[in-house]
């Protein structure tokens, strides 16, 4: 798919424009300069033409932010990848030395470049564009990322110059969320997979503030990778941008099929890791525990047993989640992650026939009779699978609210034993049904 890159100094409104074009809230928007540290990708469509948009970090040579060199590296990569570029100016602030710096980088490029004066909310404000004439660019376009003024006209021009879209990747690709506390190695892992520094990597926790979607192909198969900001415990989140990032990270979990829950093997599993694993379990996505930084572990046999025991004890609610050790730095076992992802996804999308389900349920009831409710035994009528991702099964019962969690756990474990679905969450729901209309499943006794 063709790519439009949005460039500009910090706080000129690139993220607001990005959200307007992509009709999303994907890029973080805030008044603080340098909010978009990383490149943020999303798809857009205008006049029937589909294309991708990248929102880059603010470009500023004298920015005191410690990540400025990394941001410049990211901007340069985005420039290389882009089929067209939109350079954004702040219509209310007028031209700045930073704008001239970026112009000096863009002018020599043999690519379509659109110069946008942002924050022009109406025709009456277009007089503000006169200040930018001194920059000597070919044509200035008034836009308002916040209100939409001028954006359709700009997009009309963009779709005319973009190359035709290449054959579309299959839509049903596996969506993978990479989650973990700050500095667990999430971005390093994705960079190792992609073979380039798509995401900012630094020793400072919280480097990746936003979530970035990236498509990669492994053995000819497409996967959608979602890297999220590190999730801190609520009490330790002070900066409002960090809070916004955490909300976005949790929303990313809602749309991923498989979550890679990254742990720091040199530290073992922490309370924070357990909280993050809990978020993944609540959203019922497939999960894989990755103990990263394995190259730094000395006594590997002892450490492996210790961390596996810790995971199984402290995150027992994810007892179905596979566990493996990796090194994002050296690439150790990184390729094997996708083999495991495929296995988890296959179970995550499994369908069980109604007849097989009811045989299993009948066997379970025979093996362990349902408990009593107000002096009468619970009656199970029948079960059916209503959806996948994860396998979701509805059991019709005379008193659904009376099914104890321990009996529910027994039924789920029985389904796992009979189907081999030992690496996916299973959602089991209970619904009311009139017993006179349905045959009651037999129980022993």
Curated annotation (Swiss-Prot):
Residues 2-166, 174-349 form the EngA-type G domain. GO terms for biological process: ribosome biogenesis. GTP 2 binds at residues 180-187, 227-231, 292-295. Residues 350-434 form the KH-like domain. CDD domains: EngA1, EngA2. GO terms for molecular function: GTP binding; ribosome binding. The keyword Cytoplasm does not apply. InterPro entries: G_ENGA (IPR031166), GTP-bd (IPR006073), GTPase_Der (IPR016484), KH_dom-like (IPR032859), KH_dom-like_a/b (IPR015946), P-loop_NTPase (IPR027417), Small_GTP-bd (IPR005225). Associates with the 50S ribosomal subunit. GTPase that plays an essential role in the late steps of ribosome biogenesis. Belongs to the TRAFAC class TrmE-Era-EngA-EngB-Septin-like GTPase superfamily. EngA (Der) GTPase family. This is GTPase Der. It comes from Desulfatibacillum aliphaticivorans.
